Amino acid sequence: MADADDIQPIVCDNGTGMVKAGFAGDDAPRAVFPSVVGRPRHHGVMVGMNQKDAYVGDEAQSKRGILTLKYPIEHGVVSNWDDMEKIWHHTFYNELRIAPEEHPVLLTEAPLNPKANREKMTQIMFETFNSPAMYVAIQAVLSLYASGRTTGIVLDSGDGVSHTVPIYEGFSLPHAILRLDLAGRDLTDYLMKILTERGYMFTTTAEREIVRDIKEKLSFVAVDYEQEMETSKTSSSIEKNYELPDGQVITIGAERFRCPEVLFQPSFVGMEAAGIHETTYNSIMKCDVDIRKDLYGNIVLSGGTTMFSGIADRMSKEITALAPSSMKIKVVAPPERKYSVWIGGSILASLSTFQQMWISKAEYDEAGPGIVHRKCF
């Protein structure tokens, strides 16, 4: 593709909770907004208030009191394509303000994404948005690129799903990828539940967003959970205040670390799954014995749900306990890990060697949506 040289590719990382979009070569996404589509709950009664039938992203968030909010991506996989199309449309035209038919677009997908999903993404890009070229990359692999490594194991935990993805010399090892349907949204729900025990009622979709904010601002991971619980019983040093939008102030104590503890003890939310530390270990154990040392020494955290302070120390402690005693364990938590998938995409799409990897519109017209399995791996 000769004409791709002068035009900046678009990188769009569609997460369950947030869309991160921008231009290849930039060091951060230009647009970050919630992956949410809101539809009015009531009929408009004011004449001349040109009400829309759907709102996307921040606008949906700000009007959340009168809307029903829907998330088209569940557990990292697109479940509602009409809403997803609205989100992409909003991304291109309102956030980035570009014509999608003029820019190649790099999309991201969850590991172990169903084949039909990839094809549908490809089809929408070429047929609805008329993209000149596109590519679909696996999220965790991009995070590893962003950390400057080609070998390591990525624990990518977002709003809807967590994955452990071992990567050796740039190739993900699909047989060893593990998926854990436990992520940020479950933590928010759990925090809603344990705040109820304190007498604070949060129930609606709009109130869930408030709890998400409490979680992001006040939660942390305890290095030693039992000890932290004991301390919190006797002292109030851990208590913090949070002001709700209506001015009411609530106090939150042990909930601060009980919430992210779910990542290490999924039984708290009734899940019979291994925690993120054990899942990471199990993933490493599914790999060839010769590469395990390289994986143990390069455990890379990525995604918004790894932003809790204390999480890297706790991971390190837990994995050291599971691994052989002589093994050197290194957990890397890059400061920009909230956006490392996007940053990796930005790096990848601007590499000169990547330019022959794009699927062009001509190739798509010739081969159909199935081309995505041949060209993107």
Swiss-Prot record:
The modification N-acetylalanine is found at residue 2. One of its GO terms (molecular function) is copper ion binding. It catalyses: ATP + H2O = ADP + phosphate + H(+). It comes from the Eukaryota. The gene is ACT8. PANTHER family: ACTIN (PTHR11937). GO terms for cellular component: chloroplast envelope; chloroplast stroma; cytoskeleton; cytosol; nucleus; plant-type vacuole; plasmodesma. The keyword Nucleotide-binding applies. Keywords: Acetylation, ATP-binding, Cytoplasm, Cytoskeleton, Hydrolase, Nucleotide-binding. This is Actin-8. Polymerization of globular actin (G-actin) leads to a structural filament (F-actin) in the form of a two-stranded helix. The binding of profilin to monomeric G-actin cause the sequestration of actin into profilactin complexes, and prevents the polymerization. Its main location: cytoplasm.
